Design a protein with these regions (language model features):
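Membrane-embedded architecture of ER/inner-membrane glycosylation machinery
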Residues: 2-7, 166, 170, 263, ...
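Transmembrane-lumen/periplasm boundary regions of multi-pass, lipid-linked membrane glycan transferases
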Residues: 46-48, 174, 187-332, 342, ...
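Start-transfer (signal-anchor) and selected internal transmembrane alpha helices
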Residues: 1-26, 216-224
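Transmembrane-helix signature of polytopic, membrane-embedded enzymes
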Residues: 12-18, 106-128
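Transmembrane-helix motifs of polytopic, lipid-linked glycan transferases
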Residues: 93-113, 151
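Short acidic/glycine- and proline-prone juxtamembrane loop motifs at membrane-interface regions
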Residues: 92-95, 134-145
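Membrane-interface transmembrane helices that cradle and orient dolichyl/undecaprenyl
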Residues: 112-113, 117, 152-169, 179, ...
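Extracytosolic helix-loop segments that constitute the early lumenal/periplasmic catalytic or substrate-binding loops
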Residues: 24-29, 42-65, 72, 79, ...
């Protein structure tokens, strides 16, 4: 077992500066934008409904139960709103706190296993990784479950590598259970026990040794299951007690269909990707930490010959996680995000060794210059009007021509930040130049680009227009709707389910219109209803995310017309965005 040097005031100051930088990078833009598709609006809508209805046990999406994910993230978003009273802040707050917590855990574990400096470098490696910045600036479940898996691995490592410390082991099992009720894959933290058992059996060094403690190991099972039971027991009890098809279907869907079918690639359309799929992800999405991969091979080989149990457990766990997701038919880049923190801890000795390497400094400086020139060139090309295809795509997404210029000016500013950092730091501090440029990029994205793209990415303007069209006494029902429509609406809206076929929604909505044809309106996606609607009697509410939205009353509906059912590909696309 390793005994790391005690931290000094200078080490703690370095951590404080790192967390301040992380707060700027991850927090820049919080409060300046609304939830963006595809997942952010649905989670924020569920959280908002929890607060308004008082029902926190069964999440709802409009009038129907939402069975796709356990409600852990939505609970935290709703709780955040109770504190800050601003949904633009509350929906992103759990991701921000999860990011800061992940960095502290990486720093502390690497500090204890290697040295305070190694801990700082490992945390910097995590913060600077492209996937970390991209994901932890969004309100997705993945940042939260990554924090929980990291906390579980941290607690297990405190026992397996720095112990014995049974309370840490039990805590790790408990947090892994919390990860399961956040997103089913939280269980992967417990895979750390397998390389530990193999390395201990082989007599490797740096591992906790216990004897006659089988009952203590066994207590990890109730700790794990107990965390799951905190949510599962009340949910199952209430659902079975109510016994309605809606609640029984919710229970079946969330317990069996979602996790198993997603792993098998039958939900979300992320199937058909080869075994090699995660290779480029680990290289590109974990950049710039991936610059250390080549040098880490030498350290891993040295650790193997030295029978270093620390590397065996950490790298063994990473390999098992990678194998787990590689074997799955359904694959997405973000699935390997939970690997990043422990991979950085395992690479900490390598980062410490190559920190001042000339090749790394020169490479980092060259990359900073390349990124800067690339962003400036992109902005200049777009602003010159010569890149017609790019402008066409952005206009299709609802961005007005007068909005493109400030967005690309911010892109140019991000490129200039890379170049300025390279000019100031030069080759002697090339790594600093690259890190500073990446930090500036995320800050510019948060405070410059995202707020200006917000109106086109969200349905805020469309829903305000729909509200004006209906008038103060009008009522609106949604057909073929998206979560952001209900979330951004300034008035209550009616729906006939989200997962129901648009044809069924439309049929029921038309019957509802007939009850008060002068007062009631249908708000619908154009492509979903145009076969049965006379466009001459339609009022266009607007366009967002390349979708046009219509408002119409009963006089626009073609008599005896029935909408066709969606094709499977169309249904998968609708479910995924």
């Amino acid at each position: 077992m390793s005994t790391a040097a005690a931290t000094t005031p200078a080490d703690r100051r370095a951590l404080a500066w790192l967390l301040l930088a992380a707060l700027l990078v991850l927090g820049a833009g919080i409060g300046l934008r609304d939830p963006w598709p595809s997942d952010e609006p649905r989670f924020a809508l569920v959280a908002k409904t929890m607060v308004e209805s008082g029902d926190w046990l069964f999440p709802r999406r409009g009038s129907e139960l939402y069975p796709d994910k356990p409600p852990m993230l939505m609970w935290l978003q709703a709780a955040s709103w109770l504190v800050v009273r601003d949904w633009r802040v509350a929906f992103l707050l759990p991701s921000l706190l999860a990011g800061l917590g992940t960095l502290v855990l990486v720093w502390d574990l690497a500090r204890r296993l290697w040295s305070p400096r190694a801990g700082l470098l490992a945390a910097i490696g995590v913060l600077s990784a492209l996937m970390f910045g991209f994901q932890f600036k969004r309100a997705q479940i993945d940042p939260l479950v990554t924090f929980e898996i990291t906390l579980a691995c941290y607690a297990l490592a405190r026992h397996l590598l720095l112990g014995p410390a049974w309370r840490w082991y039990w805590l790790g099992c408990f947090v892994a259970g919390l990860g399961v009720i956040t997103k089913g894959v939280g269980v992967i933290a417990l895979l750390m026990l397998l390389p530990y058992a193999l390395a201990r059996r082989a007599g490797w060094h740096g591992l906790a040794h216990t004897q006659g403690d089988g009952w203590r190991w066994a207590l990890g099972v109730p700790a794990f299951l107990g965390a799951i039971a905190l949510w599962l027991v009340p949910v199952a009890g209430v659902a079975l007690a109510r016994g309605t098809p809606e609640y029984l279907d919710y229970l079946r869907n969330i317990l069996f269909d979602q996790t198993a079918r997603r792993y098998a690639g039958q939900v979300g359309g992320h199937y058909g990707k080869g075994w090699w799929y995660f290779g480029p992800v680990l290289l590109l999405h974990f950049f710039p930490l991936s610059l250390a991969y080549g040098a880490a091979v030498r350290d891993a080989a040295a650790g193997w010959h030295a029978r270093d149990g620390r590397l065996a457990v950490l790298l063994g766990w990473c390999a098992l996680v990678l194998l787990f997701f590689t074997l799955a038919a359904g694959k997405r880049e973000v699935y390997v995000l939970p690997m990043l923190p422990m991979l950085a801890v395992a690479l900490a000795p390598t980062l410490l060794r190559i920190e001042q390497a000339a090749w790394l400094r020169r490479t980092a400086l060259a990359l900073a210059v390349a990124f800067g020139l690339g962003l400036v060139a992109l902005a200049a090309w777009a602003l010159s009007g010569r890149w017609a295809r790019l402008q066409t795509v952005m206009l299709e997404r609802g961005l007005h021509a007068d909005e493109l210029r400030p967005i690309f000016l911010w892109v140019a500013a991000a490129g200039a930040a890379f170049l300025l950092a390279a000019a100031v730091c030069r080759a002697r501090r090339g790594v600093h130049a690259l890190l500073a440029g990446l930090a500036a990029f995320w800050i510019v994205w948060g405070v410059g680009v995202a707020p200006r793209a917000n109106a086109s990415v969200t349905s805020a303007e469309v829903m305000l227009a729909a509200d004006r069209i209906a008038g103060p006494d009008g009522e609106i029902v949604m057909v073929a709707w998206k979560e952001q429509n209900l979330l951004m609406s300034p008035r209550p809206l009616k729906d006939f389910g989200f997962r129901n076929e648009p044809a069924e929604q439309f049929e029921r909505a038309v019957a509802w219109l007939r009850e008060a044809p002068e007062q009631r309106w249908i708000f619908a996606r154009q492509v979903a209803v145009q076969a049965c609607v006379d466009a001459a009697h339609v009022t266009v509410a607007g366009q967002s995310n390349r979708r046009q939205w219509w408002m119409f009353r009963l006089d626009a509906v073609r008599p005896a017309c029935r909408l066709p059912l969606r094709q499977p590909a169309e249904a998968a696309e609708d479910d995924g965005d």
